[in-house]
């Protein structure tokens, strides 16, 4: 099993407080060839290694470059392209609702990952300015209506979003819409003012 993590933009406009890419600001969208080319270049680094999974979890917000990302999804999945099964391709988003709807309309079973990172609007709004435009309740509703496997992504921030009450609330949100959970250790590089949750916790 080999997962390739690819980017959709240079920088990011969303300014999530814990993200080094967000601190860079947004430069531009990547083209179809630039996005698909990442998969090609990674494969060429070690030709015997073939990608079994692709995740749009690198730099940028994929659903804010939907026109290019949608084309790349076709290239990745097509037998004449990379021939990777749709269920092995995951698009990650902070919750850009029009893009989630568009992804859900595709006939292929592409996976969706939602960057939640807080179980309440108050805390999520502090960490993720995009929560003003796309509130948590609307994002959760979109997950419930997606009709395919959805994963909640949750970066663990020491003393910020990792208390027992956060876990209880998060578990309820995930259970109510049948989502999987992916708890992510914080990479300290670039996340000024935050510390990782201790591994034991």
Regions found by a protein language model. Give the residues of each.
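Conserved AdoMet/S-adenosylmethionine-binding subsite of the radical SAM
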Residues: 43-200
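N-terminal [4Fe-4S]-dependent radical SAM core
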Residues: 1-8, 39-49
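Canonical Radical SAM [4Fe-4S] cluster-binding loop centered on the CxxxCxxC motif
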Residues: 2-33
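Alpha-helical scaffold elements adjacent to nucleotide-binding pockets in ATP/GTP-utilizing enzyme cores
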Residues: 34, 38, 71-72
